[in-house]
Curated annotation (Swiss-Prot):
S-S bridge residues: none
Ligand binding (Mg(2+)): 16
Protein name, as recorded: Light-independent protochlorophyllide reductase iron-sulfur ATP-binding protein
Species the sequence originates in: Chlorobium chlorochromatii (strain CaD3)
Subunit relationships: Homodimer. Protochlorophyllide reductase is composed of three subunits; BchL, BchN and BchB.
Catalytic activities: chlorophyllide a + oxidized 2[4Fe-4S]-[ferredoxin] + 2 ADP + 2 phosphate = protochlorophyllide a + reduced 2[4Fe-4S]-[ferredoxin] + 2 ATP + 2 H2O
Residue numbers binding [4Fe-4S] cluster: 97, 131
GO biological process entries: light-independent bacteriochlorophyll biosynthetic process; photosynthesis, dark reaction
Length: 276
């Protein structure tokens, strides 16, 4: 059975870039990885495959939504380091429900028996609204990871995600492996001062600290993981280190994880004054 990881974070937080680099680090350490993009934007696997691949919803449309007519080859593309990628996709803007599409994709994976074919399955999930469909990966995940930056809006979203994880943990095995601090800037962004306090408050840890670095942005535009960028390998190893740390933590026999204890919304707003 695969190790199933669900990566969440608010839109624009760098969640997909982080997910792709975690997948790359895991693959380079010997794991067979499937990364699943669960966002209507369907660009999660772009750094792995170098293209916007066909989505599950597009493939289903071609067979008039008869699941049984699809095979893994219809929806999976292989890319960097042998990583396989799948994109759930979503309905046209202004119509349908993106969460429903994610839920359908999770069901399709089960029907195809893919949960037994990989060492690691990593879901990259939109985390602004954790409704039924978008929370579906938590039903299968061993561990959740939250991507956040050192600002209130990001922490507010992270707290809502902690609520979802706590609720799911009542019926499912999922636990929170930690928070990845992204775009860490000690010059103007306060480092991780707010995230450190939040993590302690909800009973988790900072799994890694990813620096705010031009090299990471360049890799995204190039359609590559950092591990595929020679410049990153030779000149900016500090950009690669956090993803290797995360991979090492996840590949332990018993990764450190916990059920978070979220803060009430009003309490969180009150705490902000102490973080200024």
């Amino acid at each position: 059975m695969s190790l199933v990881i669900a990566v969440y974070g608010k839109g624009g937080i760098g969640k997909s870039t982080t997910s792709a680099n975690i997948s790359a680090a895991l693959a380079l350490k010997g794991a067979k990885v499937l990364q699943i993009g669960c966002d209507p934007k369907h660009d999660s696997t772009f750094p792995i495959t170098g293209k916007l691949q066909k989505t599950v919803i597009e493939a289903l449309e071609e067979v008039d939504f008869h699941h049984e007519e699809l095979s893994p080859e219809d929806v999976i593309e292989s890319g960097f380091a042998g990583i396989d990628g799948l994109e759930a996709g979503g309905p046209p803007a202004g119509s349908g429900c993106g969460g429903y599409v994610v839920g359908e994709s999770v069901t399709l994976l089960q029907e195809m028996g893919l949960y037994d074919k990989y060492d690691v399955i990593l879901f990259d999930v939109l985390g602004d609204v954790v409704c039924g469909g978008f929370s579906a990966p938590l039903n299968y995940a061993d561990y959740a990871i939250i991507i956040a930056t050192n600002d209130f809006d990001s922490i507010f979203a992270a707290n809502r995600l902690c609520m979802a994880i706590q609720q799911k943990s009542v019926r499912y095995k999922v636990k929170l492996a930690g928070i990845v601090a992204n775009r860490v800037d000690y010059t103007t962004g306060g480092g991780t001062n707010m995230l450190d306090q939040f993590a302690e408050k909800v009973g988790t840890r900072l799994l890694a600290k990813v620096p705010y670095h031009e090299m990471i942005r360049k890799s995204r535009f190039a359609g590559k993981t950092l591990f595929a960028m020679e410049e990153a390998q030779t000149e900016f190893p500090e950009c690669l280190a956090p993803y290797n740390e995360i991979a090492d933590a996840l590949m332990q026999e018993h990764p450190i994880a916990s059920v978070p204890v979220p803060i009430g919304d009003r309490e969180l707003f009150k705490l902000v004054n102490g973080w200024q």
